[in-house]
């Protein structure tokens, strides 16, 4: 199979780094750093599309749907990284945000030969998750042409799910297939074709926004505090106390007492302190208001 990389921005040569092998270490790093500065600006231009995807994910969550990432190589690993951080940060279920990578778990640590070129594998991995119309698929590939991702996107479209993509090449097969295309154009890489660099950084910034935005919209952040964090280790036990103190301006003793009364459920402890309620009353208000602290407190007045 012949692949034409001629017109891909991510495969073009960067004039700023053409002689990078002759530079001193500090000058080499300055070139890399100067190129990295362009990434956030490229992502900024895609904020309207990112916003659309955040809203689509939020609606999917409300209906019991999931966010599924699919990618190969660096793109797949970044999706898995973002998905894996949601449960410890937001107390979400592991199956709510899932990352798929061409070649499966083996490919997380080392490349799996030809896996990314298999469209059927992309479709099969989605079928293995019982992917359906309630879910949202985000295909990730710097090139915008990875067959594994395109196969997954085609299947997602066939079941009438919302399909988005993150690519660093405009007018790609993925952007044509997606309902919503996020395309931060970061330009040529410092090392030609090494899309784990600027393209990968752009993808990570977008992924951060997608899950953070959807979790905020789902009531898992109060102010800027991660109020659904679960105390799964000593550090997080202390973080819970700190969150309750900062959210309510109460004493450490009050925070500890409230958390103990509600079995370490941070949101309940906050509502208890702010609304002066028992653990049972606070939990009921939260349940009645879909976990949103502000709405729960307002309803309790």
Curated annotation (Swiss-Prot):
InterPro entries: Etherase_MurQ (IPR005488), Glucokinase_regulatory_CS (IPR005486), MURQ/GCKR (IPR040190), SIS_dom (IPR001347), SIS_dom_sf (IPR046348). Residues 57-220 form the SIS domain. Its EC number is 4.2.1.126. Keywords: Carbohydrate metabolism, Lyase. Pathway: Amino-sugar metabolism; 1,6-anhydro-N-acetylmuramate degradation; Amino-sugar metabolism; N-acetylmuramate degradation; Cell wall biogenesis; peptidoglycan recycling. The active site is at residues 85, 116. It is an enzyme of class 4 (lyase). The keyword Lyase applies. GO terms for molecular function: carbohydrate derivative binding; carbon-oxygen lyase activity; ether hydrolase activity. Signal peptide: none annotated. It catalyses: N-acetyl-D-muramate 6-phosphate + H2O = N-acetyl-D-glucosamine 6-phosphate + (R)-lactate. GO terms for biological process: 1,6-anhydro-N-acetyl-beta-muramic acid catabolic process; amino sugar catabolic process; N-acetylmuramic acid catabolic process; peptidoglycan turnover. It comes from the Bacteria. NCBIfam families: N-acetylmuramic acid 6-phosphate etherase (TIGR00274), PRK05441.1 (NF003915), PRK12570.1 (NF009222). Specifically catalyzes the cleavage of the D-lactyl ether substituent of MurNAc 6-phosphate, producing GlcNAc 6-phosphate and D-lactate. Together with AnmK, is also required for the utilization of anhydro-N-acetylmuramic acid (anhMurNAc) either imported from the medium or derived from its own cell wall murein, and thus plays a role in cell wall recycling. A lyase-type mechanism (elimination/hydration) is suggested for the cleavage of the lactyl ether bond of MurNAc 6-phosphate, with the formation of an alpha,beta-unsaturated aldehyde intermediate with (E)-stereochemistry, followed by the syn addition of water to give product. Homodimer. Belongs to the GCKR-like family. MurNAc-6-P etherase subfamily. PANTHER family: GLUCOKINASE REGULATORY PROTEIN. This is N-acetylmuramic acid 6-phosphate etherase. It comes from Photobacterium profundum (strain SS9). The lineage of its organism: Bacteria, Pseudomonadati, Pseudomonadota, Gammaproteobacteria, Vibrionales. The gene is murQ.
